Amino acid sequence: MYGPGRYEPDPTEGITNVKDLPAPQLVAYHRDHKQTACPRCSQLASRHKSGQRLLHDLGDLCTGHPVDLLVAYSSHYCDRCTKHFNIDLSDLAPPGAHYTHRVIDVAVRVVSEDGLPYRPASWHLWRDHRVFVPFATIQNWVEAGGKKGARAHGRRVSRVGT
């Protein structure tokens, strides 16, 4: 039984293989629209096809499982521009990213504000937020200032977190 002052160890402590971590909870998220405005000319564009994207989000601390967002999105075709485009998901995650903005923000904050090195920051994200992020990914985010695809400012190699 849990109580004040009683230590309950993390059941995942000591796991060295990522595949042994608890399975994620899948949360369905829909951005599949029949029509949407074209970002170039603002004309209504009809849905061309649908797709799915898997995003890792901050986990559920009550169940101890990570949370994965399964985002159903639509791809559209504009007759006027003759261009294809996907529905905008930039409020959830950067283009091409596997993690949500919330995960990226927490990871960069843990390293830059709390001063944790990258490997302990990776463990901290798992222990306190139930999201597994490889330490090299955290390093890339910190060196890019939290922006995917951006370059480190001024130097070739950042010394932050080392």
Model-derived features with residue positions:
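Short, conserved DNA-binding cores of transcription-related domains
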Residues: 1-90
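Short, positively charged, Gly/Tyr-enriched micro-motifs
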Residues: 1, 63-161
